[in-house]
Amino acid sequence: MEIILAEPRGFCAGVKRAVDILAITLKKYRNKRKVYVLHEIVHNKYIVEDFKRQGVIFVNSIRDIKDNRGILIFSAHGVSKNIEDKAKRKGIQVIDATCPLVSKVHKEAKRYEDSGKELILIGHKNHPEVKGIRGRVNNPIVLVQTLQNVRDLKVKNPDNLSYVTQTTLSTDDTREIITALKLRFPNITGPNLKDICYATQNRQNAVKKLTEIVDIVLIIGSKNSSNSNRLLDLCTARGKRAYLIDNYSYMDKSWLQGIEKIGITAGASAPDILVDELINHLKINVNTKVSVMSDGVTENVQFKIPHLV
């Protein structure tokens, strides 16, 4: 049996930056000040549970913070202006781990609003990134999730529209929605697919290639990870059997019956250790050869850690 690894896979620069910010902060203030994170630092169960064991306190609301002398970290997904203001009023020190690519969308949305445009956001309703983007502007943003939403859209002035997108969407689905928006509203302006993060696009392109050369795809990632779910959707859309699993223990041996080539990838918030554990588990159970797909993309993007850390 052959294992073929997608390239790239796993951590993106924004996730690595957020995880590093939290790790450095925890090391700096351990036994001195409590470290809080609003929501999950990234959408990965392993990462969150590991930080919990180290003493990080994850909260769902500013109200849940009991010690104002602590440090509050905003997750990689970003937050609304209202959340920022609440933290400021509480007087707690804040370190912002928002992915710079998400912050870029925040600025785009505000710039469009300041120019008088009515805003449309392509994204998933309950995702924290979407909540953050909607909360960066003063006026309501119309949310579009599907082509049907585009058909049903009611706007004030069809000639005065702009759109932005969540960074972790399917590039194929988003392209279709943008095309539909432009057909219905020819004067709409927006970034095309530039808001979708490079890492999301690279991982999706790698999985598309992977589905052509393997019999099954195993995707390491958590169920609440948007970009991991998009990898699963891509495999399914191409008729390739695929499973999204948190780690090797979720794998069912029956999945491998009659399989010669296994493709493995990982969402942008899944650490390398989980891929390594899956490979080792497979090696123990079956005779395997491991290789990396030959035409993958090497990523060299790095984001700076804020000076407060």
UniProtKB/Swiss-Prot annotation:
Catalysed reactions, semicolon-separated: isopentenyl diphosphate + 2 oxidized [2Fe-2S]-[ferredoxin] + H2O = (2E)-4-hydroxy-3-methylbut-2-enyl diphosphate + 2 reduced [2Fe-2S]-[ferredoxin] + 2 H(+); dimethylallyl diphosphate + 2 oxidized [2Fe-2S]-[ferredoxin] + H2O = (2E)-4-hydroxy-3-methylbut-2-enyl diphosphate + 2 reduced [2Fe-2S]-[ferredoxin] + 2 H(+)
Enzyme Commission (EC) number: 1.17.7.4
Chain positions recorded as isopentenyl diphosphate binding sites: H43, H77, H127, S225, S226, N227, S269
Cofactor(s) recorded in Swiss-Prot or TrEMBL: [4Fe-4S] cluster
InterPro entries: LytB/IspH
Entry-linked CDD domains: lytB_ispH
Note accompanying the cofactor annotation: Binds 1 [4Fe-4S] cluster per subunit.
Keyword flag Zinc: no
GO BP annotations, alphabetical order: dimethylallyl diphosphate biosynthetic process; isopentenyl diphosphate biosynthetic process, methylerythritol 4-phosphate pathway; terpenoid biosynthetic process
Family membership: Belongs to the IspH family.
Cited PANTHER family: 4-HYDROXY-3-METHYLBUT-2-ENYL DIPHOSPHATE REDUCTASE
Summary of the function given for this chain in its UniProt record: Catalyzes the conversion of 1-hydroxy-2-methyl-2-(E)-butenyl 4-diphosphate (HMBPP) into a mixture of isopentenyl diphosphate (IPP) and dimethylallyl diphosphate (DMAPP). Acts in the terminal step of the DOXP/MEP pathway for isoprenoid precursor biosynthesis.
Name listed for the protein in its UniProt record: 4-hydroxy-3-methylbut-2-enyl diphosphate reductase
